[in-house]
Every structure is written in structure tokens, then in C-alpha cells.
């Protein structure tokens, strides 16, 4: 039969399992475009995830800000969550930049493999000759894997403004996504 697997864990295509909606044990996933007022206000949800918010149009049709429109759908959930992710666009006009500036502003500090100095790895620490990163304290060069081998063991998220209620995290492209999930236990 088309759209069906037989046996244990069978998945069936129906109104609960479409391209934009996936139902699974314990919940569901519903996808909507930022330009779709109907999709953004479709049903109450406890968790919202927005990807590339700096590329959102200022208005979802004639309904207004897409994030405000979708966030209104969480009002019935006291433990609601809103997650916004984006590469910043134009300085001073970036939605994610503005959100980060009003958040706790957490950055991940890695310990140097040699001296142990905790630091946020920056592009300026990259040695272009070797492709390695230089420690700001001892000036030793280390390959990326040497910094990241202990990523989740000794590093730490440091919040510049810990008293702010909104948690914001600056993620660099060098941080392995599979290890970011483990960090939630230490935030």
C-alpha cells in the first residue's frame, strides 16, 4: 500500500501525518512559513522554534509581526518556550541582534589545552598559516579538535547579564551541534 509501512512502528499517511504536520508519541511537529498568518495562528502550542528570524518579513500578510502572531498561540501554556535562531544580518536592524542584546548574553568559554585559560574562541585567534587557534593567554597554537575534545567536560556558558529573564546564547560556527544538546544540563 502506498504511504504505509507494515510491522512495528508503522507510519500511516492521514490528516495527522502530512508534509507540514507530524504526529508522534508524546507530541506533534507543525511547520509554518513566517509569511503565512493562517499557519502561524493555526493552533495553541507550548513550544515555538523560529529559524532565521532576520529573514522574516516585517508582517505576515496584513496580520502584523509573524513572531508576535505565533507567540500569541502559546498564551494558554504557563511553561511556554520561544526559541529564535538566526545569523545576524544588518547591524542595528537585526532582530536577533536586538534580542541578544536584551538577553543574558551567554557565550561559551573553552579552556586552553595547555594553560587552561577560559576564553571565547574568536576569528582573530585563527592562525592562517597553520589553520590552528592561538590561546589569548599563553599564545600556544592548537588544532580545532584539541580545543573541542574537551568541549563539554571543562568549558562553560558564562552569562554576561545573568539577572535578565530571557536567556540568550551566542553560538559560533565552530561549536559542534551534536554537543550543544548536552550543554542544556549545565545552563
Where are these regions (language model features)?
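Short, flexible loop motifs at catalytic/binding sites
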Residues: 1-187
